[in-house]
């Protein structure tokens, strides 16, 4: 059985934090705020695809400034990865802290009622991917941005929260759509859980983190992966807590599954069509 890994993925953190921040806004409106997490993972999972099936350390931190007049916020974020084995290091990606992904972002919540229980949370960001060992930098000349331009939306409400993340990847002129539903549940004042189901769809040119990037596999795009996940958070103090996460991920695109069977039996991207993934770590906010 695969090792379990529990981690707080940055994309899920951003979606869920919108609801937490809404509660803060009901009480007070701070000028500066932020959050972060750091954990150990059973592997490097992205969009329901496993890029490395051996343990990694990954973390994310961001700081934000609320704009005057209640017009949302702007901020900076930084995600990092450290492979704990030589599986990907041998490919020239370096040792500890072999990936750094900074972002700049802006966000706003459009509330539909005075009690701030129903609303549409919006966030847009530009994400750069940087690998220090390769001095890696891919720039799109028309925009001077690297790789991803993301737009995220979540329909906040007391029941079931649908969300979508739209990713524009400039290097290959490709698009990806991440969408699902989640249900935050407060068990006690300290303990909360959040089950969710998530799908990923992409056009035929968005392949870099999927098995179809290898071997010239023909693909028409469409639904790519499915993820069913349970996140658990235990708040120890006002600003510090612990998290655990476990997920079942499955590649549902038949082109990808065929590529795993045909040519990728020994490659990280292809040997795990269906897998369990998870992690544990710490969370903080300020």
Roles of regions detected by a PLM:
Residues 29, 71-72, 117-119, 190-192:
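Short helix-terminating capping/connector loops at secondary-structure junctions
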Residues 32, 97, 119, 223-225, ...:
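A broad structural signal for short, well-ordered beta-strand segments within beta-sheet-rich domains
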Residues 2, 21-30, 64, 103, ...:
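Intrinsically disordered, low-complexity regions of eukaryotic proteins
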Residues 42, 65-70, 82, 110-113, ...:
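Outer-membrane beta-barrel transmembrane domain signature
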Residues 51, 78-180, 264-270:
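Outer-membrane pore/translocation modules
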Residues 19-69, 73-88, 106, 277, ...:
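Short glycine/proline- and aromatic-enriched beta-strand/turn motifs that initiate or cap beta-hairpins
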Residues 1-33, 114-116:
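Cleavable N-terminal export/targeting peptides
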């Amino acid at each position: 059985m695969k090792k379990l890994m529990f981690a707080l993925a940055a994309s899920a953190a951003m979606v869920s934090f919108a609801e937490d921040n809404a509660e803060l806004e009901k009480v007070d409106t701070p000028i500066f705020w932020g959050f972060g997490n750091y954990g150990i993972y059973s592997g490097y999972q992205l969009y329901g695809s496993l890029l490395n099936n051996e343990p990694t350390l990954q973390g994310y931190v961001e700081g934000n400034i609320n704009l005057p007049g209640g017009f949302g916020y702007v901020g900076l974020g930084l995600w990092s990865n450290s492979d704990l084995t030589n599986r990907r290091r041998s490919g020239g990606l370096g040792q500890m802290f072999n990936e750094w992904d900074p972002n700049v972002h802006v966000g706003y919540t459009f509330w539909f009622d005075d009690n701030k229980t129903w609303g549409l949370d919006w966030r847009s960001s530009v994400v750069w991917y940087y690998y220090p060992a390769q001095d890696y930098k891919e720039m799109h000349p028309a925009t001077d941005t690297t790789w991803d331009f993301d737009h995220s939306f979540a329909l906040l409400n007391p029941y079931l929260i649908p969300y979508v993340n739209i990713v524009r990847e400039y290097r290959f002129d490709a698009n990806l759509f991440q969408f699902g539903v989640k249900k935050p549940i407060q068990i006690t004042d300290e303990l909360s859980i959040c089950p969710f189901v998530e799908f990923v769809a992409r056009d035929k040119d968005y392949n870099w983190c999927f098995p179809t990037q290898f071997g010239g596999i023909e693909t028409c795009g469409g639904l790519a992966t499915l993820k069913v996940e349970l996140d658990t958070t235990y708040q120890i103090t006002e600003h510090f807590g612990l998290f655990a996460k476990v997920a079942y991920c499955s590649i549902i695109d038949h082109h990808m599954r065929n590529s795993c069977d045909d040519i990728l039996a020994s490659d990280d991207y292809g040997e795990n069509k269906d897998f369990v993934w998870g992690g544990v770590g710490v969370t903080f906010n300020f």
